[in-house]
Structures are given as C-alpha cells and as structure tokens.
C-alpha cells in the first residue's frame, strides 16, 4: 500500500513541478507584452511554445497509470485541470494579436477546487500510510491558477 503511493508520487511530482516552472514563465512574457517590450507576434509565438509544452504535460498526467485506488477519482479531476488550463492557454495565445481577452475561459475556480480536492485526498492517504509528502505540496491550489493577461 505504502509503495503504491510512493510510485504514484514519483510519477506525478516531476509533472507537477514542471508545470509550475513552465507556468511561471508566462508572467514575464505577458508583462513584456503589456509594457510593449515585445510585439504581439513575439508574445503569441512565446506563449504558443509554452502552450505546446504544457500540452505535453497534460498528456503525461493523463497517462499516469499507477494510481492508488483511493486516489483514482481525485487523479481524474486533477488531470482534468490540465485540460482546462490547456484550453485557457490556447485561448490566450489566440487572443494576443488583437488584445481581445474578454472571452478567455474562466476556469480558475473549478481548477482550484479540483486541485485542492486532489491535495486533500493525497494528504489523507499519505497520513494513513505513513508517507511523507513534498513540503511544497501545501501550495497546490493556492495562488494564481492561470496566467493573467491583465497582470495579477
């Protein structure tokens, strides 16, 4: 039982941390775009690359196979947050040239709830099995979920 949770964490953690690092890269692009330090075409190109890398993470999280039974529902919800974020990023990329951000999907609340639900289930299972979780896991679901074209 303990081993299956460790296997799961070993598979999910690099994805979670990679996504965090990747999304941290969106704010400097959007900031430079807002300040007119880069053109809309450059911002769109950079955000497009970021979105394509994110899409690869979405595939990876969906492909996680060794999910402990007690986490399966939470894992499906967590993986779905990647679908929502990818849809948001795709819409953001498309909106950049015309600076038309009014119709961006508003999925932050749904994503936050799913991520927090996943984190809570993970914490409960880890406590029951005596498994230590990564120290930064408490931050999951807090803070900004999606890069904001208007700034935070």
Model regions: which residues?
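C-terminal amphipathic alpha-helix
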Residues: 1-50, 84-152
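Short, solvent-exposed, charged loop/turn and helix-capping segments
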Residues: 53-79, 94-98, 127-133
């Amino acid at each position: 039982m303990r081993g299956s949770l460790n296997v799961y964490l070993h598979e999910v953690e690099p994805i979670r941390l990679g996504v965090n690092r990747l999304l941290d890269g969106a704010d400097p692009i959007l900031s430079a775009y807002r300040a007119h330090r880069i053109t809309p075409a450059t911002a769109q190109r950079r955000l497009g690359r970021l979105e394509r890398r994110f899409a690869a993470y979405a595939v990876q999280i969906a492909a996680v196979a060794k999910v402990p039974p007690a986490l399966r529902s939470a894992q499906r919800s967590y993986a779905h947050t990647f679908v929502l974020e990818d849809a948001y990023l795709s819409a953001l990329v498309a909106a950049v040239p015309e600076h038309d951000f009014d119709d961006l999907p508003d999925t932050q609340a749904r994503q936050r709830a799913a991520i927090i639900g996943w984190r809570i289930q993970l914490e409960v299972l880890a406590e029951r099995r005596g498994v230590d979780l990564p120290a930064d896991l408490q931050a999951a679901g807090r803070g900004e979920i999606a890069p904001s074209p208007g700034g935070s």
